[in-house]
């Protein structure tokens, strides 16, 4: 052993013990012939006292090994900020294991550094306690989840990383196959179809901490490769899966955040979430809610509202407490805020703090009757501001108000940052239009293997826009941290879904033939959930980005500053991999039987 003790483990009870420590020089202080060194390893920091002649060569981040006696610090010199603050090690021997060049990044929790430099020298960044503790927390989260699942007789099973591409879901990352030029593997977007095959195979309780890959456009706080806790169960109902999800999440929050989640976690239907919060992942830490005014404002002459109502659309409002105190510049700034989200603007009325009189551009266009009852209709008080959205499409207007609700909470300091608010969003739509046109076809909101609920299973073709699915998402503080569904296991129902989606038998066979073949042989009823592991760990760590809980994350643009990936390949590599090769006609003819399609992802 290079060392006998961890630096962070030393306590007053170790006084008089001779120890050997190994780690990095976090800090050195010279005191007239004596040098004090803060020695850091993975467990913490211990103070080491060395003679100047022994330690004059030491610099920050040198990797060293010391042997010495643990002694109590002189009275008054204790450091209550450190777990080891009552003791120090008087060194008898010092060995420099390796030297450190001048540092491009300060290894100091008190000094902020830019994201680019932190990612470029991530290995130095991880020596800081904040980033290191985030990864330790993630490791503990993995252990806790595994414990919960093993207590319930789940099997941890790995599924393929190299699979077959399919146009379903997001774009795939593709891998050329050297031994079969012109053919490609795809990296999985999730283990979705493989875990369903495991259910057919009798592996009734499956889980996996799964690596997933999606070639998406650049989006804030997304990574091209990510992790989900993937779960599938046979012979279960929606309630069974939700109960398991709650067991995992409540154990995680109790042990890692010290928070006891009240169970059962509240459930809200998808349509109620959109109507009340303008979002299918509502933040319930504050109580501001949307109000629909379509019926209240029916008959108005204000063209913006009247046009939406006549088109069978939606008019709604959200209240900003104390919003009337905003300056004209601040109120006008809301228009820029709305336009940045693709809207034409955000109409508003402010209520005078003294009289409650409605003022503002919209107030001039509403009748006296509508103005008189407006405050009561939306639950506003004198001094508040009321923001409106209207449109022929209800969802777009609701989502604009939902985004305004979040921004109102931020600007008005309504969010208790120490609070935790969870909910399940259930009864999601089964289908949505491919385009805004009424003639447009249908697509599955989740994926084409999601089961319609009992009310709709025999008649979803009658009104696809109103059909509901056995689908459920779990939300924490406005973040979707997991989602899943009960799957279709009946061949006749699956065929009807394919028919509605415009997937021909040939296309279904080409994309999912192996799954449909498996479903001929007695598939059990089954369902599952995928928990977004990066986001869950981010919340538990109190981090602002999922990058903080990933060992070697990429930038928003998918670039890795540490390795400079992605990089071009050489002409020789390109030739060897067969990147430019064309598949032989026989291979194209056999595409429908070439093997498993790339999985379609649970939303996370």
From Swiss-Prot:
It is found in: Cytoplasm. ATP binds at residues 214-216, 223, 480, 532-535. SUPFAM superfamilies: Class II aaRS and biotin synthetases (SSF55681), GAD domain-like (SSF55261), Nucleic acid-binding proteins (SSF50249). It comes from Salinispora arenicola (strain CNS-205). It catalyses: tRNA(Asx) + L-aspartate + ATP = L-aspartyl-tRNA(Asx) + AMP + diphosphate. The record marks 31, 76 as: Important for tRNA non-discrimination. Its EC number is 6.1.1.23. Belongs to the class-II aminoacyl-tRNA synthetase family. Type 1 subfamily. The gene is aspS. NCBIfam families: aspS_bact, PRK00476.1. This is Aspartate--tRNA(Asp/Asn) ligase. PROSITE patterns: AA_TRNA_LIGASE_II (PS50862). GO terms for molecular function: aspartate-tRNA ligase activity; aspartate-tRNA(Asn) ligase activity; ATP binding; nucleic acid binding. Homodimer. L-aspartate binds at residues 168, 214, 446, 487. Residues 192-195 are annotated as: Aspartate. Residues 588-604 have a biased composition (Low complexity). One of its GO terms (cellular component) is cytoplasm. Residues 575-604 are annotated as: Disordered. The lineage of its organism: Bacteria, Bacillati, Actinomycetota, Actinomycetes, Micromonosporales. Keywords: Aminoacyl-tRNA synthetase, ATP-binding, Cytoplasm, Ligase, Nucleotide-binding, Protein biosynthesis. It holds the Pfam family GAD. One of its GO terms (biological process) is aspartyl-tRNA aminoacylation. Aspartyl-tRNA synthetase with relaxed tRNA specificity since it is able to aspartylate not only its cognate tRNA(Asp) but also tRNA(Asn). Reaction proceeds in two steps: L-aspartate is first activated by ATP to form Asp-AMP and then transferred to the acceptor end of tRNA(Asp/Asn). Residues 577-587 have a biased composition (Basic and acidic residues).
């Amino acid at each position: 052993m290079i060392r006998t003790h961890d630096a962070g483990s030393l306590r007053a009870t170790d006084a008089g013990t001779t120890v050997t420590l190994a780690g990095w020089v976090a800090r050195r202080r010279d005191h007239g012939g004596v040098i004090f060194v803060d020695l850091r390893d993975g467990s913490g920091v211990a103070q080491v006292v060395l003679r100047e002649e022994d330690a004059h060569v030491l610099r920050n981040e040198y990797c060293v090994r010391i042997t010495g006696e643990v002694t109590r610090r002189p009275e008054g010199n204790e450091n209550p900020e450190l777990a080891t603050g009552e003791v120090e090690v008087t060194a008898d021997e010092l060995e420099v294991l390796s030297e450190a060049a001048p540092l491009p990044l300060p290894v100091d929790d008190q000094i902020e550094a830019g994201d680019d430099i932190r990612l470029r020298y991530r290995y130095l960044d991880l020596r800081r306690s904040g980033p290191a503790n985030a990864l330790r927390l993630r490791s503990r989260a993995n252990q806790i989840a595994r414990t919960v699942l093993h207590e319930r007789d789940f099997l941890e099973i790995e599924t393929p990383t190299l699979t077959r591409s399919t146009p379903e879901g997001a774009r795939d990352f593709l891998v050329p196959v050297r031994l079969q030029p012109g053919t490609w593997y795809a990296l999985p977007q999730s283990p979705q179809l493989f875990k369903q095959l495991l259910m057919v195979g009798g592996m009734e309780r499956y889980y996996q901490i799964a690596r997933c890959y999606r070639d998406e456009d650049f989006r804030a706080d997304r990574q091209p490769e990510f992790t989900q806790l993937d779960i599938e169960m046979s012979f279960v109902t929606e309630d069974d899966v939700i109960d398991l999800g709650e067991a995992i999440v409540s154990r995680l929050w109790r042990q890692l955040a010290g928070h006891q989640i009240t169970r059962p976690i509240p459930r809200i239907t998808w349509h109620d979430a959109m109507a009340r919060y303008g979002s299918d992942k509502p933040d319930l830490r504050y109580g501001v809610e949307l109000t629909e005014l379509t019926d209240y404002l029916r008959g108005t002459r204000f063209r913006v509202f009247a046009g939406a109502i006549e088109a069978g659309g939606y008019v709604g409002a959200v209240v900003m407490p104390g919003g009337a105190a905003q300056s004209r510049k601040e109120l006008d700034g809301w228009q820029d805020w709305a336009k940045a989200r693709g809207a034409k603007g955000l109409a508003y009325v402010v209520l005078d703090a003294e009289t409650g009189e409605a003022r503002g551009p919209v107030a001039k266009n509403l009748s006296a009757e509508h103005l008189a009852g407006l405050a009561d209709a939306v639950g506003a008080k004198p001094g508040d501001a009321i923001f409106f959205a209207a449109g022929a499409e209800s969802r777009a207007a609701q989502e604009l108000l939902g985004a305004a609700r979040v921004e109102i909470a931020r600007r008005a300091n309504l969010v208790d940052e120490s609070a935790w608010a969870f909910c399940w969003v259930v009864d999601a739509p089964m289908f949505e239009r491919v385009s805004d046109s009424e003639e447009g076809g249908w697509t599955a909101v989740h994926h084409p293997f999601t089961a319609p609920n009992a009310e709709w299973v025999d008649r979803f073709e009658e009104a696809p826009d109103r059909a509901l699915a056995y689908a459920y998402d779990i939300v924490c503080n406005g973040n979707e941290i997991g989602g899943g569904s009960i799957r279709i296991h009946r061949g006749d129902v699956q065929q009807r879904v394919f028919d509605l989606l415009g997937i021909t038998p040939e296309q279904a066979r080409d994309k999912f033939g192996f799954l449909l073949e498996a479903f001929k042989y007695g598939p059990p009823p089954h369902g599952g959930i995928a928990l977004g592991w990066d986001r869950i760990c981010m919340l538990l760590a109190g981090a602002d980005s999922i990058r903080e809980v990933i060992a070697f994350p990429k930038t928003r643009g998918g670039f890795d500053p540490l390795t400079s990936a992605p990089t071009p390949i050489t002409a020789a590599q390109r030739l060897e991999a067969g990147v430019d090769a064309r598949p032989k006609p026989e291979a194209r003819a056999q595409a429908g039987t070439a093997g498993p399609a790339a999985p379609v992802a649970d939303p996370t």
